[in-house]
Amino acid sequence: MKRFCFALFLPAVLTCFSHRAAAQPASNSVAPPTATAPVPTSEEKNQAGYEKHTREVLNDLKLEDAARIAKVHDIMVAQFADWKAWHAKNDAQLKELWAEYGKARNTKNQTNIDNAMSPIDAVYATFKPQHDAFKAKLAAVLNPEQIETVENTLTAGQLPRTYNAYGEIFHGLTEGQKAFILKKLKTARAEAIDAGTKDEKAAFFKKYKDQIEAYLTAQGYDVKQSYKDFVAKQKAKKAATQPDVKPAAGDKE
């Protein structure tokens, strides 16, 4: 009788163990390798940069015509590629020349400044064919106001910002004086769009700011005092708009 009971019990035990074994993963199993994202090539990184900067231009233009958007896109991407290739060949030389220009500018001697700027202009003259072709391609798709939008985007809006600041700093500017300032700033912008860095773009604007301020001095403005008055006014305005902060409970006044 005992042997009969054991015979009945044994299949049930084996079935139980087989279920437990199936429920547990094998200790020797190997997990599948994790897929790694492919490392982008330098060309792919460059292309991503061209697309990013092109989107910035298109966002500011706010074009609605798909065909024009596509044309401006292709023009901008091609220009960024030409621009990067040119800077790869010339940036080492330009870095040294801009350093010399900075030293010359500190002397406040216009002859020294002009002499230091001359070789920089000579280097950038080699990019002029690409610059002119770029402007011609834009002119075939965009109106003059839209081209100015492109130029302002490429120079981080330095022209309108600087022009408006001059109006606040130097009171009573005549229409002729305003026209002179705007013309110089437009020349600065035209040169700065080819620059390789933010600092270099700013340097082109400084070049023409110096000329504007020399002009305003000749026009009877006290440039240094005008700047001091403007800074003092801005500080007073900021102080007036800041809320009074009361001491917290328990703090000593």
Report the location of each language-model feature:
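Positively charged n-region of N-terminal signal peptides that target proteins for export
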Residues: M1-F4, Q24
